[in-house]
């Protein structure tokens, strides 16, 4: 422990408990942690890894949805701005609806009927569109 920071050894269960009990998350902009945070209604400060297109997009969409902020450098001003706005982001996250996998499971079931004939047909048509 140093001032208001607690350093902990790796622990999957400990991490999940910390994520569930925290007020907000500050991390890179990877999809998995961001969506887990949204599901738990945790405001998010994203620090996208430079050159990682997925993370750049995730950070952009995070800010657009108003679930948190997307920053390049963790300055005290940027972090302070995020901390001040946690109640606003938490309010916005109340409207977050987890989509689950039902739609993709339904579509996969449709495509795999008749030993995958529909999936092969879909793939063949799609390949014709690619030059």
Region roles according to the model:
Residues 10, 29-32, 74-78, 99:
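Short beta->alpha linker loops
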Residues 34, 38-92:
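Catalytic binding pocket for nucleotide-activated donors in carbohydrate/polymer assembly enzymes
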Residues 14-17, 78, 103:
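An acidic, carboxylate-rich microenvironment
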Residues 80-131:
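C-terminal amphipathic helix plus adjacent low-complexity
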Residues 2-38:
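Donor nucleotide-activated moiety binding/catalytic core segment of transferases
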């Amino acid at each position: 422990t140093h001032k208001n920071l607690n350093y902990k050894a790796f622990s999957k269960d400990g991490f999940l408990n910390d994520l569930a009990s925290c007020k907000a998350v500050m991390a890179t902009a990877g999809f998995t942690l961001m969506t887990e945070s949204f599901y738990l209604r945790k405001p998010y400060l994203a620090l996208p890894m430079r050159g990682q297109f997925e993370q750049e997009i995730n950070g952009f969409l995070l800010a657009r949805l108003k679930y948190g902020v997307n920053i390049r450098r963790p300055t005290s001003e940027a972090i302070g701005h995020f901390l001040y706005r946690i109640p606003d982001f938490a309010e916005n996250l109340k409207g977050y609806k987890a989509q689950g996998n039902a739609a993709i499971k339904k579509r996969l079931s449709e495509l795999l009927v008749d030993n995958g004939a529909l999936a092969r047909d879909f793939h063949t048509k799609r390949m014709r569109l690619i030059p």
